[in-house]
C-alpha cells in the first residue's frame, strides 16, 4: 500500500498541526553552542519550511492558539500586576516603559526608513524583542483594522516573516549583550550584588540549598541549666542563639508545649526543631551525649506549605516584620511571578507572593491564617472561572472607539489580556476562586503559543524565499538595532536618572525584555541571585506592555504617512 504523505497532511488539518508541533519541538531542543533554539523558533522554522511546500491550516486553530496564550499570560501577571503598577514598583514600571517605548519608536522609524509595510515592521519589532505577545497583539489588531483582504493577507504574511528573520538575531544579540555590557560599565556586578547583600542582610549565593527542618530531643543536664542561668525561654532567645526552637518539653513524665515563661530544669527532655546545620552548631551543653529517643517527644508533624500573601496586615510589610521564627516556622523560599527571590528581610511583600514555609502543622496553619492562605494543592482546574473570564475578555475585545472618521477597537488580545489579569488578581485574593494549577497553566499557554506559531509559519512560508532575498540585509541591521539600542537606553536611564544598584538594574532590564536565558547570564556574572529581585519587578508589567506595543504599532502606523 502506497501512502502519499503530502495528500494525507493536506487532507487532515489536525494531523498536519501535530506533525508540525512534533517536528518543531524536536528541532527546538537543538543547541547552537550554549544557546538552545527553543520551542517557539523550532515550531516556526518547521512550519515555514512546510508552508513553502504549500501546506496550510485552518485559521481558526491559529486564532484559538493566540487567544489561549495571551489569556494565560494575563493570568500569570495578575497577582503582582497591580502592586507593581500602583505602589513600590515605580522604578520598575518606568524601566519597562522606557524599554518597550524606545523599542516601539525605533521600530517605527526603521520601518519608515526602509519603506516596509506594517507587517514587516511589527514582525521585526516582535522578533527583535523576542516577544510573542508583540506578535500576537499586532496580528489581532491587523485582523480587526478593516483593511482590504489582499492587503491584510500580505501584512499577516510579512508579520510572520519579520518575526522569523529577526527572532534569533534578537535572542543571540541580547545574550551576548548580557554577557559583555556589564563589563563595559565601571561598576562590577558582583560588587554591586554584594553591596545590596550587606545593606539588606541577604544570602548572595545563587545556588543556596534549602533543607527541611528536623526534630531532635535532648535531656537537660547541669551544663545547660547553668547556661540558662534561671532565665525563661523568652529571655533566653533560644532561636537567636542556636537557630533552633523548643517545640516540646517532657517534665516528670508529662508532655507539654512550652510558652515563653517556661524555665528549663534539670532532667527535662526537650524537643528542638531546626535545620540540620543548626543542630550541628549546637553548644555542647545541649548535646554532650544527652540526646534521647522518645517516640512521643519526637512525634511531630513537620509540614512544608506554600502560603499566598493576601491579608492587609502582611501586604506592604517587610519580610522581617512577619517574625516567622518567633512563631516556630522556617522560611525556605520567596516566589514572585514564578521567580525565586533572595530571602531578604527587607523585601516588601506584594499581594500574590508565595512563601514556602516549614514547621509544625499547627504553627504553619496559624501563620497562614495571619498572612493569607495555604495554596491549594489540588490538580483540578476551575474551568468555570476560566471559561467565564475568557468570554469576558472576548466581549471586551469587541469594544470599538469612534473618533470622527477614525475608529479602532480594543481587540481580542488586549481584552483577553485584561480579563486574564483580573482572573489572576482575584485568584490571589480568594483561595477557592479560579484555581488553575501552575502545570496546567503552563501547558495551556505553551500549547496555545505553539499552535499560533505553527499557523503563522504555514501561512507565511510560501513567501519566505522572496522576502529573505528582498529584505534580509535590512532585517539583520534593524534586528540588531531594535534589540540592543533600547537596552543601552534603559541602562543609561536606570543608572544615571534612577541611580539604581547595577545588579538590580541589569536584572530589571532582562525582566523588561522577558528573557530568562539572559537573566541566567546576569546572575552568573553577579555570582548571585540578587538580580532576580529586579527581574521579577519588571517581568509582569513588561508582558502587558509588550502586548499593548503590538496593538499600538498597528494603530500608530497609518498616521505616520
UniProtKB/Swiss-Prot annotation:
SUPFAM superfamilies, sorted: TrkA C-terminal domain-like
Gene: ybjL
Gene3D superfamilies membership: Regulator of K+ conductance, C-terminal domain (3.30.70.1450)
Domain RCK C-terminal: start-end pairs: 200-288, 292-373
Main location: membrane
Record-level GO cellular component terms: plasma membrane
Subcellular location: Cell membrane
Keywords: Cell membrane, Membrane, Repeat, Transmembrane, Transmembrane helix, Transport
Keyword Transmembrane attributed: yes
Name of this chain's protein: Putative transport protein YbjL
InterPro entries the UniProt entry points to: AAE_transporter (IPR050144), RCK_C (IPR006037), RCK_C_sf (IPR036721), Transp_YbjL_put (IPR023017), YidE_YbjL (IPR006512)
Amino acid at each position: 500500500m502506497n501512502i502519499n504523505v503530502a495528500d494525507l497532511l493536506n487532507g487532515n488539518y489536525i494531523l498536519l498541526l501535530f506533525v508540525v508541533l512534533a517536528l518543531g519541538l524536536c528541532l527546538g531542543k537543538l543547541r547552537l553552542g550554549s544557546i538552545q533554539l527553543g520551542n517557539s523558533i523550532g515550531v516556526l522554522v518547521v512550519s515555514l519550511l512546510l508552508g513553502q511546500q504549500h501546506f496550510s491550516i485552518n485559521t481558526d486553530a491559529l486564532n484559538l492558539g493566540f487567544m489561549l496564550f495571551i489569556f494565560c499570560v494575563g493570568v500569570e501577571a495578575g497577582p503582582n500586576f497591580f502592586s507593581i503598577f500602583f505602589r513600590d514598583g515605580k522604578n520598575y514600571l518606568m524601566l519597562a516603559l522606557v524599554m518597550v517605548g524606545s523599542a516601539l519608536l525605533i521600530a517605527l522609524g526603521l520601518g519608515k526608513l526602509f519603506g516596509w509595510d506594517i507587517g514587516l515592521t511589527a514582525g521585526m519589532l516582535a522578533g527583535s524583542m523576542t516577544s510573542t505577545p508583540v506578535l500576537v497583539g499586532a496580528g489581532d489588531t491587523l485582523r480587526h483594522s478593516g483593511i482590504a483582504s489582499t492587503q491584510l493577507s500580505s501584512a499577516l504574511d510579512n508579520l510572520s516573516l519579520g518575526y522569523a528573520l529577526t527572532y534569533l538575531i534578537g535572542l543571540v544579540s541580547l545574550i551576548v549583550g548580557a554577557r559583555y555590557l556589564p563589563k563595559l560599565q565601571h561598576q562590577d556586578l558582583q560588587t554591586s550584588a554584594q553591596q545590596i547583600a550587606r545593606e539588606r542582610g541577604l544570602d548572595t549565593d545563587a545556588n543556596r540549598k534549602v533543607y527541611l527542618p528536623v526534630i531532635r530531643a535532648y535531656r537537660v543536664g547541669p551544663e545547660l541549666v547553668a547556661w540558662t542561668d534561671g532565665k525563661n525561654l523568652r529571655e533566653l532567645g533560644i532561636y537567636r542563639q542556636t537557630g533552633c526552637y523548643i517545640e516540646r518539653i517532657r517534665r516528670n513524665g508529662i508532655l507539654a508545649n512550652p510558652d515563653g515563661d517556661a524555665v528549663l530544669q534539670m532532667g527535662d527532655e526537650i524537643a528542638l526543631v531546626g535545620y540540620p546545620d543548626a543542630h550541628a552548631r549546637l553548644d555542647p551543653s545541649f548535646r554532650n551525649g544527652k540526646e534521647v529517643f522518645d517516640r512521643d517527644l519526637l512525634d511531630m508533624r513537620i509540614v512544608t506549605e506554600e502560603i499566598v500573601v493576601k491579608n492587609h496586615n502582611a501586604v506592604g510589610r517587610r519580610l522581617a516584620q512577619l517574625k516567622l521564627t518567633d512563631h516556630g516556622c522556617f522560611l525556605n523560599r520567596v516566589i514572585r511571578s514564578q521567580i525565586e527571590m533572595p530571602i531578604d528581610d527587607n523585601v516588601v511583600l506584594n499581594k500574590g507572593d508565595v512563601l514556602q514555609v516549614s514547621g509544625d502543622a499547627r504553627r504553619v496553619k496559624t501563620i497562614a491564617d495571619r498572612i493569607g492562605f495555604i495554596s491549594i494543592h489540588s490538580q483540578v482546574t476551575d474551568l468555570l472561572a476560566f471559561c467565564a473570564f475568557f468570554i469576558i475578555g472576548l466581549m471586551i475585545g469587541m469594544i470599538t472607539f469612534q473618533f470622527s472618521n477614525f475608529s479602532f477597537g480594543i481587540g481580542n488580545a488586549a481584552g483577553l489580556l485584561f480579563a486574564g489579569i483580573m482572573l489572576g488578581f482575584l485568584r490571589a485574593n480568594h483561595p477557592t476562586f479560579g484555581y488553575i494549577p501552575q502545570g496546567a497553566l503552563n501547558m495551556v499557554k505553551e500549547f496555545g503559543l505553539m499552535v499560533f506559531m505553527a499557523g503563522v509559519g504555514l501561512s507565511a512560508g510560501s513567501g519566505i524565499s522572496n522576502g529573505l532575498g528582498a529584505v534580509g540585509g535590512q532585517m539583520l541591521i534593524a534586528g540588531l538595532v531594535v534589540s540592543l539600542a533600547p537596552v543601552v537606553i534603559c541602562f543609561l536611564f536606570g543608572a544615571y536618572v534612577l541611580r539604581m544598584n547595577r545588579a538590580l538594574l541589569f536584572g530589571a532590564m532582562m525582566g523588561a525584555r522577558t528573557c530568562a536565558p539572559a537573566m541566567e547570564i546576569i546572575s552568573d556574572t553577579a555570582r548571585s541571585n540578587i538580580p532576580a529581585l529586579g527581574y521579577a519587578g519588571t517581568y509582569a508589567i513588561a508582558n502587558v506592555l509588550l502586548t499593548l506595543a503590538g496593538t499600538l504599532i498597528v494603530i500608530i502606523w497609518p498616521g505616520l504617512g
